[in-house]
Every structure is written in structure tokens, then in C-alpha cells.
Amino acid sequence: MVALRLIPCLDVAHGRVVKGVNFVNLRDSGDPVELACRYSDEGADELVFLDIRASVENRNTLVDLVSRTAKSVKIPFTVGGGIDSVSSINDLLRAGADKVSLNSSAVRNPDLISKSSREFGNQCIVIAIDARRKVNKFGEWEVYVKGGRENTGIDVLSWAKKVEELGAGEILLTSMDGDGTQNGYDLNLTESVANIVDIPVIASGGAGSLEDIFDVFKEGRASAALLASLLHDKKLTLKEIKTFLLEKKLSIRPYE
């Protein structure tokens, strides 16, 4: 059985790690390189580094920061934010990233998914989907882009299936309704996507307790859980989370 993964997320704006609630009201959470090293040392299975201002400000992710961060850790590392071309992906992979995350650019140009998958292998291509529930529509979600600022009107489940067909190797699925709230993952959203694709789904948005993380694996059928404010605020440690999940008999790489 493939081990379930715990993945700290470093949302970066203007060179600093930030975290907000529902994609707004951002607060400073520290230096990205320092936090990357800390989480790597504490037993993270992977890291995700997202330049959350890049797609809004129409600039590329800072390759220098990626390079410094990647050189400081020994675990797989995903980079996202403002990546809109095969050449940009190449630059980031050469700078030390193991994977790249595409979001707005993939919606705007779906061919980028297939082109990059053919060029670098689908194991390198993560598609980030920012999902928000439709008003008064249970079990229906729409895809948002531009850092959650623009509603595309695209159905999340249809888009998830399409990106898999185009060559995505993984889906990073964020519940905008749960982001930063620490009120629990959107299990209905996560399970709905996991049930219609055969590629791993990383659940994001809402982790607030040990039980939340257990539930997203057990009920949500996620392959990985993204963790941000829960760790940044030192509410829980990776060791505590892994110990709890191992006691629950989940397939987790032990804390070392």
C-alpha cells in the first residue's frame, strides 16, 4: 500500500510565508526557507511552495527563492504560482523543484497540461483546483482562478476528470470555503473528486485537528493532506500527527 502523505504548504507573498482565511486577510507566518527546513527536519513527506501573488501580478515564481529552498531540504518539493509555459516549468525544475503546480494557466490553456506532461512526465505535473461551493447547491462546486479572485463557472468534477485525461499526475484540491478556518476539510468535495479520478488527490483547506486529518484520509479518500496554519501556528506538530495516524492504523511513513 502506498503511504499516505503529510505535506506542509508554504504560501508565499513578497518573499514571506503568509496565511489567511478563505484566501483573504493574510498574516505573516515566517521565512520560507527557514520553515521549509523546519518541516523537513520534523518529518514532512513533501513540501508545497505556492507564490500566491504571482498569477495575480502576472509574474513568474521567484526562481532564486525556489533554488534556495530546494537546496535546503531533502524531500520532494512542489512549486506553483504564475507558471504559464513549458519554459517556465523547465526553469523551476532545473532550479530544484521536483514538481510544478499549475492552476490559472491550465484553465486558460489546457494544452499546457498535455505539453508539459509529455515533456517532463506526468509525475511532475500537479493541477491545483481552487473550489468553492455553489450557493444553495449541495454537492456542486465551481473552479476559481487568479488566487481565488475569479470564478470561471467551470464545474470542479468535470475539470478534475479533464485534467486527468490531459496528463496531470496529481490534483491539489483546495476548499476555498474551508481555507484557513481550521474547521475541517470538505470531505464531500474531497471524496467526490477522489472517486472520479485515478490519480492522487491532495486535500487542502480546513485542517484544525488530528481527527480532521484522519477523516480526510479515511472518509475523504485523499492520498495526501496539505497542512498550513495548523503547523504555522504550532497548534500541532508533524510528530503528533504521525503518531496519532499510526495509532489509527493508517499507512503513514513513521516519524524519524
UniProtKB/Swiss-Prot annotation:
Cell location: Cytoplasm
GO cellular component, one term: cytoplasm
This protein's pathway: Amino-acid biosynthesis; L-histidine biosynthesis; L-histidine from 5-phospho-alpha-D-ribose 1-diphosphate: step 5/9
GO biological process, alphabetically ordered: L-histidine biosynthetic process
Chief location category: cytoplasm
Keywords, alphabetical: Amino-acid biosynthesis, Cytoplasm, Histidine biosynthesis, Lyase
EC numbers on record: 4.3.2.10
Recorded coiled-coil stretches: none
One term of GO molecular function: imidazoleglycerol-phosphate synthase activity
Pfam assignment, any one: His_biosynth
Record field: catalytic activity: 5-[(5-phospho-1-deoxy-D-ribulos-1-ylimino)methylamino]-1-(5-phospho-beta-D-ribosyl)imidazole-4-carboxamide + L-glutamine = D-erythro-1-(imidazol-4-yl)glycerol 3-phosphate + 5-amino-1-(5-phospho-beta-D-ribosyl)imidazole-4-carboxamide + L-glutamate + H(+)
Active-site feature positions: D11, D130
Domain of life: Bacteria
Family membership noted in the UniProt record: Belongs to the HisA/HisF family.
Subunit and partners: Heterodimer of HisH and HisF.
NCBIfam families: hisF
Function per UniProt: IGPS catalyzes the conversion of PRFAR and glutamine to IGP, AICAR and glutamate. The HisF subunit catalyzes the cyclization activity that produces IGP and AICAR from PRFAR using the ammonia provided by the HisH subunit.
The protein's name: Imidazole glycerol phosphate synthase subunit HisF
Annotated organism of origin: Prochlorococcus marinus (strain AS9601)
